[in-house]
Every structure is written in structure tokens, then in C-alpha cells.
Amino acid sequence: MDNLLVRGLTHKLYDKRKATAYELERVVKGYLENDETEKIRAVISQLANDFVYSPARGPNATFGGLIGLAAVAIALGPKIDSYMESILLPVLYCFNDSDSKIRYYACESMYNIGKVAKGEVFRYFNLIFDVLCKLFADTEITVKNGAELLDRLIKDIVMQQAATYMSSAEDIKNFKEGPVSSSIQDVPVMSTEQPRMHTFSLSELVPLLSERLYVINPNTRMFLVSWIRLLDSIPDLEFISYLPFLLDGLMNYLSDPNESIRIVTSNCLYDFLREIQKIAKVKYHILQRDEESEPDFFDSMVRRNMSDAELKEISDYVESSLRDGSFILEAHIQIDYKRILEIIIDHLGSSVPLIQEKALKWLFEFIYIAPKDVLLQIPKVLENLLPLMSNDENMRQSAKDLSQNLVILVSKIMDIEFSGSETNNKDNSLSVDFRSLIEVLQKLLSNDNEETRLCALEWVLLLQRRTGGKLINMHDPIFQTLLLQLSDPSDLVVSRTLELLAHIAISHKSVNLVPFLKSLLQMFAEDRKFLNSRGNLIIRQLCNYIEGERVYTSFAGILETEENLELASIMVEVLNNNLFTAPELYDLRKKLKQSAPKLQNIFTTLYTAWCHNSIAVFSLCLLSQNYEHAANLLSVFAEIEFNIDMLIQLDKLVQLIESPVFTYMRLQLLEPEKYPYLHKALYGILMLLPQSSAFRTLRDRLQCSSTPRTNTILANERLPRSRRDDPYWTDLLERLKAVQLSHQNNYREPIRATRLALAGALPSTPTATTISTTTSASGITTTASNSRDSFITRLPPTAALSTGARKKPKQ
């Protein structure tokens, strides 16, 4: 350039620089007409090196260089492709300048270059796009305005030419984009993208776009979302194939504090989902119309989520395209559903409600779009899904609906797997990782939220049922976790846990039932509060899920040989109370009342265990209408020491006699000639009771049924003794005596040990005898010395009373 042009371009006035640029444009056009390419390159080089890159020059020189480069580009017109690199790079360099005016003029220059170059900008698209990202975050309003203008131009070029433009330039084959790099590795070039040389390439843009998505600036975020929506709106680009690289960043935008960003991102994700659904529906329709291919269960899932109107719309679209010979783009697009699902599942565990809501929606739809991929991800899905049960009502309901749909899907695949039917022949690799699934559900059983624990139990129960009880046994870690769940504060959780444990216990020909009940008994032994708070509920629910007779006879077999006599007595008391009151045990009570020989084994089995609790045995005899044996038990009662617990049990028995369960027995009191031993047994209980409310209740009942005729029968007629010497009943009575003797010895052992310990501590030759005077609760004054005989006063009150009761009182 001559000195006149140089001075004009570096002038401080914009109008002077603009006029000089017009002159420069005229000069370059002359060079172009004369094919003087070297002079053109010299002008471009001078503008770049002497005006833009030179640090000695002031800002006016840079302004002149930028407007000069734009003038050269305009002069070159369609032939700019050979000079594109040398013109564009100096302009891009200016976008990093600290002077906002230079950045603005760079926008203006790039705009003019873009208007001329059009599709040629695709060769440097990543560089331009990266610059635009930074410009939208610029704090200077004029720069942002210039960036928006440039952005609109580039978008127009992309819309018009991105899918079709092919560059004719040959001088940049070895050009490498240095300033911009990406940390995203191994981005594949989709097979559906036609090879384009030096033109718009998604495989080069997407890594940069994916990386920039993690910026914080709201303006840049809006810019990025707008570009994503634009690229997706160009059908031939098949942009949807690259969604896995962008989805994570987009989902994060749903937590942006700026509402407008959340809205535009939500709409963008909605469009992506609709597009994926359409692709799946088109592929299903094409597969369905193919006579050689028959859609299987999974292929047909997409149809289940289509209305008749949608089905007709898709059918019309496919059929019309085939008639016209049009290319059906949706049929050829490949989408990585697995990677999309992984991202969605990760975001399901987000703490942001909008992200959770969007993830739920996508997962719900993917059950129909890609059921096989969902099945393979089931453990991770449930790990993040079930904790959502603790959220608000709407979120909880959405999570429940999704869980229910997953239940249907898993149930179907389990039916297929365990029946060995059609679908497995098509895809032998399809299988649910049950072990991983059980491990996840085991962790969820410890979740703080009740709904989550319940849902986890429902899932385990489903899996156990669908596998025919083969999935879980007593040796699996989850079994111990389930036992611990029995102490859950929620009755619903306990009930569901018992249903599952019952299913495990009765599977494999019930070989697990007795070990399970032993484990349960061990828990009761270790935690008495657990027995008191949950014992009745557990027993009743077990009898609801397993036949009551099996539960009780199995418990009886265990308790018969139980070495912990105190535990055995308490457990028999709990079992006995439920036997009389639980609706779940109605059938067992009915069987015990019958006198059929084949049902006698039930009574015998229970009796041998019930011997650990004498009052329970007596109750069992009344329930089974073995009144003679009940009357004979009174002789055993006379030999054992009654304590406060036994008196409380007698009080409860009287209450039971007044309850509906003993209606039949109360009516039998009206037939003393037929049931004489019933009167004797009840009168015996009356004599054992202290004069309390229970005593008066039973006395009144007996008086109501007592008539002169009854008294005559009981006084004068000899009671039948046909069964007294029967070996069967004799053995049962002896069994009771032996067990009760063991209990008495077990009760006295601590007292005896204390006596011996204290006796050993006394001096062998006492030096003095201390006499103490005490007053008993009855007001009787007694004296006791410090000799061994005085330890009788340290026995429990009931023991002392029973000892004295057997002594003949002085006259």
C-alpha cells in the first residue's frame, strides 16, 4: 500500500478510515482483475503485521487494520477462499485485546468478512465459535451488541449452508487449529455423517460445545443453548446423535438461578425427547411393516406409549415418504441410548427438584423407547429413584409411577428368562443383574424415609416371587438386614418385611422355616424390649403369610428343647395369648377344638412346648376341651410356687373366659352332667386366685351357671375317670411336672447361690447373735437371727407365702 493509504487507515477519525477502506477495496479489486495474487497477499500481510500485530502502533492503527482487512475481503468476494486464513486470523487475534473498542471493531470486521465468505467460515468455525462464547460474556455493552449481530449472521450461514457447503480451497489442507483445544476425548465421527473436507463438521464442534457448556456466565449459557437448538433444527446434520456429549451440561442448566435459562433449557430438552420418541416410533413402524421381521416384546414397547392418533400420524408419514421415494432420515439415525440413560440416572440423584422432575420424565419415556437399555441399568435406576419417595407429594407420586412401570418391565423380562421363551432367543445377552439389584435394595432398606424402605421391600418381594423363591436364601447378607427391619418403627415396614421373610422361609420345601424362627427367637432373647413391642405383631403377621399351624408347631418344636427356660416361658405366654386372640389363628383354634385323632398331634406338639408355662398349658386344655386333663393339672399347681407373673396370667385367662373365644365353653357350663370336669377346673382356678376383680368375675360367672341340680351333680355323682390312667395323658402330665420342676430349680438357683456365698462369709464361731424385729406386710411381727435359717426371710414374698401355705396352721 502507498503512504496515502497507510496514513488514511491510521487516521484518528472513523470517517477518514472508512473512506480509505473504500479506496483500498478499489485497489484490491484491480489487483484481482489483473490476477496479481502476490500483491493481494502483500496487502493482507501488511495489514496484519504492520497494523494489527505490531505493538508499536496505537489503537487507531489496529482500527485501520481491521477495517482494511474487511475491505480486502469485500473486494475478493467469491474468491476469498484462497486468502481466508491470512484475513481471518488477525481479526480473531483482536478479540483478545483489552481495549473494548478494538474488540467491537473486530466484531464489525468479522461481520463484513462473514457476509462475503459465507460457507468458508466453516473451515475455522471452532475458532469463531470460541470467540463468540467469550464475547457474550463481555462486560462492555457495545461489544455484546456487536457479538449479537455477528452471532445472528453466523447462525444464518449455518442454517443455509451447514449441511451442504463444500469448500474448494486447497491451500489449507495442512492447517491446524491451534488456539482452541478440547479436553473431551474420543468423540466418534458418526457413521451417518457424510465426509466433508474443510466444511462444517459436528464431530469437531461438539467437543468444544460440550466443554463450553460448563461455563457459569448466564449470557454465555443462553448463547450455547440457542446454538444447540439451532443445530438440532437442521435435519440433515443429525445433531441428535451427539446428544450424549451435551446432555449432562444441559441438565445442569436446570439448576441455574436465572429463570429464563431454566425455561429455555427445559424447552430444549423437551424438543430432544420428542425427537427421540419420533425416531423410535418411525423405526417401530418400519420394523412392523417388514414381513421378514416380527417385533418382539421390547420392540413393541414403543407402541404401548402411542395413541391411535400418533400411530396414524407416524404411519402416514412413513407411507407417504416411501411412496414418494423420499429419504426417511429417522430410520437411519443412531442414538446411544445407553450413555443417555447413564447421564439421566446420575441426575436423578440430584438435589434440584427441576432436574429430578426432568430425569423422571425422560426415564419414564425411555422405558418405552429403549427398554433393554433400561433393564441393564435397573440397579442404578432404583438406587437413585427410590430415595425420591421422601420428596413432596407430586415428586413422590411421579417416582411411584415410574417404579410401577419398572416393575411391569422387570416382571415381563423375568417371566421370559425363567420360562426360556421367545425373546431370549433373539438376544441371549439380555439379563438383569439380580445380585447387584439385591445389593442396592439392601442399602435402601436402611434409608431414613419410610416410603423408600417400603418400596425397596416391594421390589425384593417381587424378585423373590418371580424367581420362585430361588433368589434369596438364609445365607445371603440381605437376610440379616431383613431381620433387623423387624424392629423398624413403622408397622407397615414390619408387615412387608415379614411377608418377605415368610416367603423366604417357606421356599425350598420349607427347609428355611425352622432356622428362620430360631433366628427370630434369638433376636427376642437378645432384646426383651423388641419382644414386648413387636412380638405380637410379628407372630400375627407370620401366621397371616404362613399357615398358623405350621408357625406354631415349628415354634413348639424349637421351644421344647430351648435351654433358656425364662425365654421359653415368656415365648409360650406370648404365643398362647395370640393363639386365643389373633384372627389369623382362627383355623388353628378350630382344629384344636375338634377331637379327631389325626388332629391330636397338633395338641400334643403344642402341649410339650407349652409345659414351659403352666397357665398356658391350662389355657390350651380349655381351648381344646380337654377339661378332665385341665382339672388334673390342678394337682400340679398345688406343688409349684405361684409368683406374681403366674397370677397375672390367671387374671388374663379369666378375661379370656369372658371373651367371645370361649363362648362355647360358657354355654357348656349349663350342661354339668356332660362337662363335670369343666366346673372342677374353673373352680380350681377360682381357688388359686386371690380375692381380686378377676376372682369376683369368675365367681359370678360360675354362680350364674350354678343351679341346685348342678350342685347336686358335683357333690353326689362320681366323676368319670376313664382317661386318668390313660398313658397318653399320664405322659403329658409327667412332662409338665418335669418341665415345671426345671423351672422351679432354675428360679431357686440364684437364691441358693446367694445363700451359699453369704454363708461362706459368716465367721465359723459367732461372737454375738443379733436379733432383729421386722413387721411383714400382713402386720405380723417376726424375729430373725443372723443364722442360715434366717435367710428364709429373704425369699421373694410369693415364695415365702407358698412355703407357709403348705404348713398346717396352729390351732
UniProtKB/Swiss-Prot annotation:
<dbReference type="GO" id="GO:0000329">
    <property type="term" value="C:fungal-type vacuole membrane"/>
</dbReference>
<feature type="repeat" description="HEAT 3">
    <location>
        <begin position="240"/>
        <end position="278"/>
    </location>
</feature>
<dbReference type="InterPro" id="IPR026825">
    <property type="entry name" value="Vac14"/>
</dbReference>
<dbReference type="GO" id="GO:0005737">
    <property type="term" value="C:cytoplasm"/>
</dbReference>
<comment type="subunit">
    <text>Component of the PI(3,5)P2 regulatory complex, composed of ATG18, FIG4, FAB1, VAC14 and VAC7. VAC14 nucleates the assembly of the complex and serves as a scaffold.</text>
</comment>
<feature type="repeat" description="HEAT 6">
    <location>
        <begin position="431"/>
        <end position="469"/>
    </location>
</feature>
<feature type="repeat" description="HEAT 2">
    <location>
        <begin position="122"/>
        <end position="160"/>
    </location>
</feature>
<dbReference type="Pfam" id="PF12755">
    <property type="entry name" value="Vac14_Fab1_bd"/>
</dbReference>
<comment type="similarity">
    <text>Belongs to the VAC14 family.</text>
</comment>
<feature type="compositionally biased region" description="Low complexity">
    <location>
        <begin position="775"/>
        <end position="785"/>
    </location>
</feature>
<keyword id="KW-0926">Vacuole</keyword>
<feature type="repeat" description="HEAT 4">
    <location>
        <begin position="334"/>
        <end position="372"/>
    </location>
</feature>
<feature type="repeat" description="HEAT 5">
    <location>
        <begin position="375"/>
        <end position="412"/>
    </location>
</feature>
<dbReference type="GO" id="GO:0010008">
    <property type="term" value="C:endosome membrane"/>
</dbReference>
<protein>
    <recommendedName>
        <fullName>Protein VAC14 homolog</fullName>
    </recommendedName>
</protein>
<feature type="region of interest" description="Disordered">
    <location>
        <begin position="775"/>
        <end position="811"/>
    </location>
</feature>
<dbReference type="InterPro" id="IPR016024">
    <property type="entry name" value="ARM-type_fold"/>
</dbReference>
<comment type="function">
    <text>The PI(3,5)P2 regulatory complex regulates both the synthesis and turnover of phosphatidylinositol 3,5-bisphosphate (PtdIns(3,5)P2). Regulates the synthesis of PtdIns(3,5)P2 by positive activation of FAB1 and by controlling FIG4 localization.</text>
</comment>
<feature type="repeat" description="HEAT 7">
    <location>
        <begin position="472"/>
        <end position="510"/>
    </location>
</feature>
<keyword id="KW-0677">Repeat</keyword>
<dbReference type="GO" id="GO:0006661">
    <property type="term" value="P:phosphatidylinositol biosynthetic process"/>
</dbReference>
<dbReference type="InterPro" id="IPR021841">
    <property type="entry name" value="VAC14_Fig4p-bd"/>
</dbReference>
<dbReference type="Pfam" id="PF11916">
    <property type="entry name" value="Vac14_Fig4_bd"/>
</dbReference>
<keyword id="KW-0472">Membrane</keyword>
<feature type="repeat" description="HEAT 1">
    <location>
        <begin position="81"/>
        <end position="119"/>
    </location>
</feature>
<keyword id="KW-0963">Cytoplasm</keyword>
<dbReference type="InterPro" id="IPR011989">
    <property type="entry name" value="ARM-like"/>
</dbReference>
<dbReference type="GO" id="GO:0070772">
    <property type="term" value="C:PAS complex"/>
</dbReference>
